[in-house]
């Protein structure tokens, strides 16, 4: 039986996990909850055998996980992608945290009615965060070298999100522009992005001021 990935029918916290699974060509079944299916999830959440019931969840045989980072790390670990030595494992963990500084930074303001005001401060700090990744990629194909690791998909997702906030935010970062195109050119990812499985919108929950609703801004 294929593993089950359960989440809202949005990008949200689980999009990097979807990208990783597609890259690995690992068969999985998605249980997607629509905008109006909150009651469906609440009625089901305690019937799945999850120790800490929440969305997203991942069920792989007797392994039943929640929390997005636990899920993506588990999948990476299954495929020996967490690093071959303590230094490499620590660097991969560091990269996770650095990407989450951007992604969670967006999420913290995305639901506020004062988003437009808060966005100004976020965008003023964004170049400093992006420059660190630009420098990291100066002599690397991917964040950890020549091989893809899960923080690459986390960064790809974060870049996708901030480009909706400011379409010119990568103009000063050619390495990041190339990195994003490189991820999209991976055959498995290219196929996924063009498939009906790909969820383009919303970026956040439907109720979010930024990245919410049923359709992207024109």
UniProtKB/Swiss-Prot annotation:
Q: Name one GO biological process term.
A: glutathione metabolic process
Pfam families per the record?
GST_C_3, GST_N
Oligomeric state and interaction partners are given as: Homodimer.
Phylogenetic lineage: Eukaryota, Metazoa, Spiralia, Lophotrochozoa, Platyhelminthes
The record's listing under Gene3D superfamilies reads: 1.20.1050.130
What is the source species? Schistosoma japonicum (Blood fluke)
Please state what class of enzyme this protein is: transferase
Q: Which SUPFAM superfamilies match?
A: GST C-terminal domain-like, Thioredoxin-like
Query: What name does the UniProt record give this protein?
Result: Glutathione S-transferase class-mu 26 kDa isozyme
Molecular functions per Gene Ontology: glutathione transferase activity
**PANTHER family assigned to the protein according to its UniProt record, in alphabetical order:** GLUTATHIONE S-TRANSFERASE, GLUTATHIONE TRANSFERASE
């Amino acid at each position: 039986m294929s593993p089950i990935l359960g989440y809202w029918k949005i990008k949200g916290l689980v999009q990097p996990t979807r990208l990783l699974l597609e890259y690995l060509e690992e068969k999985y079944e998605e249980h997607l909850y629509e905008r109006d299916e909150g009651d469906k999830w609440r009625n089901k959440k305690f019937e799945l055998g999850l120790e800490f019931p929440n969305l997203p969840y991942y069920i792989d045989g007797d392994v039943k996980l929640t929390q997005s980072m636990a899920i993506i790390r588990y999948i990476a670990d299954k495929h020996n992608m967490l690093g071959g030595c303590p230094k490499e494992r620590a660097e991969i963990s560091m990269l996770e945290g650095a990407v989450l500084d951007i992604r969670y930074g967006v999420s913290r303001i995305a639901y506020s009615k004062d988003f437009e005001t808060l966005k100004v401060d976020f965008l003023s700090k964004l170049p400093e965060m992006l420059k660190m990744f630009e420098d990291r990629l100066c002599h690397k194909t991917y964040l950890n070298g020549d091989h893809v690791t899960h923080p690459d998909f986390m960064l790809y997702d974060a870049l996708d999100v901030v480009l909706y906030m400011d379409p010119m935010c990568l103009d000063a970062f050619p390495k990041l522009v190339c990195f994003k195109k490189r991820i999209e050119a991976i055959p498995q990812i290219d196929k996924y992005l063009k498939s009906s499985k790909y969820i383009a919108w919303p970026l956040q929950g439907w109720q979010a001021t930024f990245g919410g609703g049923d359709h992207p801004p024109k």
